[in-house]
Amino acid sequence: PYAEYLSEKVWKPLGMEQSASISLDSKKHRIAKSYGGLTTNVRDLAKIGRLYLNKGNWNGVQIIDTAFVERSHTKKYIGSNNGTYSYNWYWGTTDHRYFKDKESLRQYYKAFPSMKIATTMRSNKTGDYAAIFHRGGFWAEGLYGQVLYVNTEKNYIAVFLGADRIEDYCYVFDRLYEIV
C-alpha cells in the first residue's frame, strides 16, 4: 500500500527517472518503511527537493498539501532533543553554539545578526543554553552520507551523495549560503 501510494501520487507525477527501492521493517512482517529507507538516484532526489522548494507544487499541480510541506520544516518540540527534527526533515541547518547563560546568547546574537536563531534549548545536565541557528534551509539525511538540502530563503536545492556519514553538513550548508 505505501509503495503503491508513493508510486502513484509522487513518483509518476514527478516523472522520476528510475524506480526507487524501499526498505522493509523486517523479513517476517515485510512492511515498507515510510520513515526512511528510500533509495533513489541523485536526479530523482533533486526532484523531491524541488517539490518541497515549491511548497508541494510540481509544474502547476499540487502533489503535496502546502500546509503539510510547511509543517514539515517547522519546529515541533521546543526544549527537547528533537527540537530541530520534524517529518523526516532537519531544519536547524547552520550551527549549534553553547552559552553559559541567556545574556551570553543575546550578546552573540547582537554581534552576528545574520545568524537567525531557530530555537534554544537548555541542557538539564550542564545548565548551558544551546542555540541552533538557521538560514532558511532544511535537509534530510540518508544512512551513508546522502543529503538533500532545500533552502527556501535563497531558492536552491543541493544533493550530496556519499559512502560514509559525515558530520560537517552544517559547515557545508553555511558555506553554500554565503556563496549562493
Segments predicted by a language model, with ranges:
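Structural helix-adjacent loops and short alpha-helical linkers that scaffold large soluble proteins
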Residues: 1-7, 56-64, 165
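A small/polar active-site loop signature that marks catalytic segments
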Residues: 1-25, 35
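Structured C-terminal helix/loop/strand segments within mature extracytoplasmic catalytic/sensor domains
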Residues: 109, 137-180
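Alpha-helical scaffold elements that line and support the substrate/ligand-binding pocket
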Residues: 1-10, 44-52, 155-158
